[in-house]
Structures are given as structure tokens and as C-alpha cells.
Design a protein with these regions (language model features):
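Conserved structural scaffold segments of CAZyme catalytic domains across common CAZy folds
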Residues: 1-45, 49-50, 162-164, 171-174
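Loop/turn elements at helix/coil->beta-strand transitions in domains of secreted/extracellular proteins
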Residues: 15-16, 50-55, 96-103, 209-212
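Aromatic-lined carbohydrate-binding/catalytic grooves of carbohydrate-active enzymes
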Residues: 28-29, 46-90, 108-112, 216-224
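Non-membrane alpha-helical structural segments and their capping/turn regions in soluble enzymes
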Residues: 34-41, 85, 89, 187, ...
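Hydrophobic or amphipathic alpha-helical targeting/insertion segments
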Residues: 91-126
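Catalytic domains of carbohydrate-active enzymes, especially glycoside hydrolases
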Residues: 39-64, 199-211
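Alpha-amylase-like alpha-glycosidases and glucanotransferases acting on alpha-linked glucans and related
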Residues: 8-18, 22, 112-223
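Conserved, mostly hydrophobic/aromatic
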Residues: 21, 47, 57, 75, ...
Length: 224
């Protein structure tokens, strides 16, 4: 296994005082009964007056919300209940004008079962997403101690999940592969998953996000 890369911490982080916000229970700006991102922007001065200079924004991406947004359907789209991508970019800009920073909750270990990646991974025909998730090689075989779901996909295999049925585990490989379906942690399939997640981070960093709080930040490989 490769050692973790070393990068300097951003200077602002040393003095950061975070205010954590779960969007739906904060400020409702449009009267629909659900907190939203424009509501957060309206309260930036209030948050700064409390002595906070950074915001940790809990999951705000498109999701069926079967697990409070920790089941992401589209990493590059803000959940419609919270607003739009432009609303989130406006929050970044407004925070920066106040010398504040915003980090996003990133869930890299699994997606929603409604994510397009998973829909493609379920197909019988091999494609670029067949190994984006962890699948066994037979629908009657379990996950060697890992939780799994079988019999719900056209392909022959069961998929490994992290928590709930709605959260299929993304494939970052196995530290010590022992089965034919267990991909190596440094193999091309695991690298493709890593590259996809890096692409998500670059997408939001390029639009003004200051960083990420990584959910389940321990190494994503199985079998460690």
C-alpha cells in the first residue's frame, strides 16, 4: 500500500472555527418548510457574529434522502429541496467576501442505489462501470462477512453495501484479495473509482468550495 500523500494544510484552517449546518433544519428562505442554501447565505453575518469563520455544510447533493443525504444520487448537482448549483456558488462567494470558508460533506464510500453509476454497474453487459462497485461473481454467493444484497440486478452477482440497502459500496479494492471478485487496491478498477471521486472534488473546488469533510475518512479499501 502506498503511504498517504503529504500536502500542506491551507493557512486558514489553523484558525478555523466551524459552524456545522444541516441545510434542511437551518433557515427556510422560500417558505416550503425545508431549510435551503439561500437561507444559509442570509445568515452568514449572524454566523460570523457568533465568532465562527468557517461552515461545514452537511450533505447537500442530489439524493433520494433515504439516509439524510448520505446516499448521493448525483455528486455534481445540489438537491432541489436545497436550491441549485448557482445558489451554492453564491454561498461560496458571499462567504469569501466575509473572509469565511465553506467545506462540503463528501461521501466517497458509497452512493445511492439510484446513482447512474450503479444503474450501469447492474447491467449484464460489461461496461466501464461494471466494477465501480463491489460485486461477487454469483448471485448465490455472499460477501465473505461483508453485508450484501442479491437477486435484484440483471447481472449475476450480489453487491456489497456499507450501511443500508440503498448504499452500494464503491470499489476501492481489497488490501489482500482472496476471491476472484475481490479487486486489488492498487488495480485499475480501484484507480478508476479514485479518479471519479477526484473529479467530483475538482468540480466543486473550481466553483469556490474551500475543501471537504470526508465521511468515513478511514481507508476505503476492504479487508484491512
Amino acid at each position: 500500500m502506498l503511504p498517504p500523500a503529504k500536502h500542506p494544510h491551507p493557512k486558514w484552517l489553523a484558525d478555523a472555527i466551524f459552524y456545522e449546518i444541516y441545510p434542511q433544519s437551518f433557515v427556510d428562505s422560500n417558505g416550503d418548510g425545508i431549510g435551503d442554501i439561500p437561507g444559509i447565505t442570509l445568515k452568514l453575518d449572524y454566523i460570523k457574529d457568533l465568532g465562527c469563520n468557517a461552515i461545514w455544510l452537511n450533505p447537500c447533493f442530489d439524493s433520494p434522502f433515504k439516509d439524510a443525504g448520505y446516499d448521493v444520487r448525483d455528486y455534481k448537482k445540489v438537491a432541489s429541496r436545497y436550491g441549485t448549483n448557482d445558489d451554492l456558488i453564491a454561498l461560496f462567494d458571499a462567504a469569501h467576501r466575509r473572509d469565511m470558508h465553506v467545506i462540503l460533506d463528501l461521501v466517497p464510500g458509497h452512493t445511492s442505489e439510484e446513482h447512474e453509476w450503479f444503474h450501469r454497474s447492474c447491467k449484464v453487459e460489461r461496461n466501464n462501470y461494471s466494477d465501480r462497485y463491489i460485486w461477487t461473481d454469483s448471485w448465490i454467493s455472499g460477501g465473505d462477512g461483508l453485508p450484501f444484497i442479491g437477486g435484484e440486478s440483471p447481472r449475476n452477482g450480489t453487491y456489497i453495501l456499507n450501511f443500508f440497502k440503498c448504499q452500494p459500496a464503491l470499489n476501492y479494492g481489497f488490501a489482500h484479495p482472496e476471491r476472484s471478485w475481490q479487486k486489488p487496491a492498487l488495480g485499475p478498477d480501484a484507480k478508476a473509482t479514485c479518479d471519479a471521486m477526484v473529479d467530483v472534488m475538482r468540480f466543486w473546488l473550481s466553483r469556490g468550495a474551500d475543501g471537504f469533510r470526508v465521511d468515513m475518512a478511514q481507508p476505503r479499501q476492504k479487508g484491512r
